[in-house]
Structure formats: C-alpha cells, structure tokens
Amino acid sequence: MGGLRLNAIAIDEVRDIFGADEGLAMKLRRWAEARFSVPVHHHRRPRWRSPFHPLYKPNVECSMLPTGWPTPHDVEDLVCGRYIESDRSARCWRLVNEWLTHLSWGWTEIPMSVARFEELDRDLAAAGLPSTYSLKRLMDEDPQIPLRPAPGMKIGYAGTRQILATWVELSEVIGTVPIARRGEVNAVLKFLSSYPGWNHLAVDLGRPAPGLLVVWQPDTVEDAHPTGLRAGRTAS
C-alpha cells in the first residue's frame, strides 16, 4: 500500500543535515548508530593451505548487515553532503527518516496508496474544500535537498502559511466527508492542528517556524508502516 509520512520541520533544518556542522553531525552519527548498529558475528573458517592463498584465520569478525540496511558509508556520505547514487537512495531514506524523528517537532505516518491519496482530494473537493488547499498542495514545493526520492517515492514541502490555511479550511469541511472515508483526513487534520503550538515554541527556542516535509513511500521502501498510524513529537 505504501505510507504517507508528515514531518513538522523547517526546510532549512532539513537541508542542514546534508553537510552538517560538527555538532549536528555528531548527533546524526549517534542516532544512526543507536538505530542501525548490528552485532559483530564470529565466523569460523577451516584451516587449510593453498599455493595461492595464505593460511585462513579461524576467527574473522565482520558486521552482517540486513538487506536494505544503511551502512556507515551511507551515514558519512549524507552527513558530508555527498552525492548518493539511486541504488542507495532507499536505504539512505531510512537514515533520513530516523533523523527526522529526532529533529522534527512532530511526525506521523498514515497508511495510504497513491490512488487513495488522489481519492481523498476528490472527496474533499466534493465536500467543498477549495483546490488551493487540497492535500496535493501540501506537496507542491520541491524541498531541494541533495537526496532525491527513491524509485516510486514522492516528496514535497509546504510552508507555514499554506499549512495553517489548509488546517482552517479542512476544519470547515471535515464534517461533510463521509464517515467511512474520514480516517486519513482526520489524521492529517489532527497533525496540522499542532502547528500553532509548535510555532510558539519555535519562537521561544529560537528555531525557525516549522514547515511540512511530506514523504510518500511505496511498501517496497523500508520503514514505511502500512499496518497502522504511527506518530511522535519532539521539541528539541
């Protein structure tokens, strides 16, 4: 099915990940190690001699990474702002999603196919939502980050003004959306309703006002959670 992930964070704070300063880079590496570290496995190899090979050592230590697991090389390339090849982008997005759970004011993941996303906008239009405030408009802007979408993935960004206006307009029409189709819209609306509070906190903490980074991931991308809603909040 895939999943729609909403991240409340200023776009400049997202861009700061790529080519991070020393303080942020230290945090990113620590979060990556805590989430993606794997134990060292001990493999016993037979002792045999060959005219072409040296004597094999009986115990060789190596890290066995699960398929699709990000590597230390991926971490360093992202932190240093280096180019990421397309065949590495899916696992690098696993890293970025993990970092966003720590850096964002809040985040949520909503199980949703592309077809369902488009259907929701049709439902909302029928309920009277102006097209200016459709869900698709929350993905209108290009985040302009070095890490491009993995195959099948879609990303977009919306600024604070668009977010708050969409929240107001959604609040006015949600009651006329059929109850059977209201779950995903309610999840989006609940998330957007937190923005006024986050904006006040941002001023108090000297951080930029949060925007909205939207990531739609197909079910082939790891860390999409199609089985249920997930959400979290931070204010660090």
Describe the function of each predicted region:
Residues M1-P208, Q217-S236:
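Acidic (Asp/Glu-rich) sequence patches and key acidic residues
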